Every structure is written in structure tokens, then in C-alpha cells.
């Protein structure tokens, strides 16, 4: 399990804008996935959720998942903090800063939720404040 000290340390390592992204996104846990939507409290697709959460920190991301992490914003996983973007082909997620935990809108029929990353080598990490 996760200890409170691990979660607090992850939270403390993130700046206020990253913290705002994470808090904003967490308000949508349980909201249904729906392709090409960004409707708080109603439905999101993966890139709609990341775009909406980052807009609340004053950063505008591209609408499509494949364009949300740019070459300028890409970071090594060791530098990733809570609120950073995670991308795999066709899917964008928000890193929780703890172990391999992410928040995302998973797929049709799914709900916005917290999940564990599997096959970490398939994922790229990005800090939108750098791009």
C-alpha cells in the first residue's frame, strides 16, 4: 500500500500549478469516458481530461493526445512530478507522482479513474510548463 509520507512527499515535490492540475483532474473521477468530449461532470476523452486540467493552471495543450507532449516538454521519468503528462500511443494520462499511478479517462465504457502504469517503457513523460 501507499503510506501517507510517500504521498505527501510526491505532493510537496510538485509546484502549485502541477498541484492545481491534479486537484482539478481528481474532481472528475467517476465521470464517463466519451470520445472527443471535454464536459466536466458529464464526459471526457483522455486528451480532453488532460487539456481541461492543465487549462486550470493557465496552460493550453493541444487537443489531440499525440500532440500534448512536445519535444520541448518531454522529460525523463526520473524528473516527473505529480500533475505531469504521461503519453503512450493514442492515449494521454496525468501522473500522480507516486510509483506508477496515473489518472485518466481510459476507454469507451470506462470511467475517469486512477490506474497503475504497466510496461513503463511504452510511456513518455512531459512537463507542459517546459513547452
Features from the language model and the residues they span:
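A conserved glycine-rich beta-strand in the N-terminal activation segment of trypsin-fold
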Residues: 92-93
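Aromatic- and glycine-rich peptidoglycan recognition patches
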Residues: 66-75, 96-131
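Intrinsically disordered, low-complexity
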Residues: 1-32, 99, 120-131
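Catalytic cysteine-centered active-site loop
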Residues: 31-82
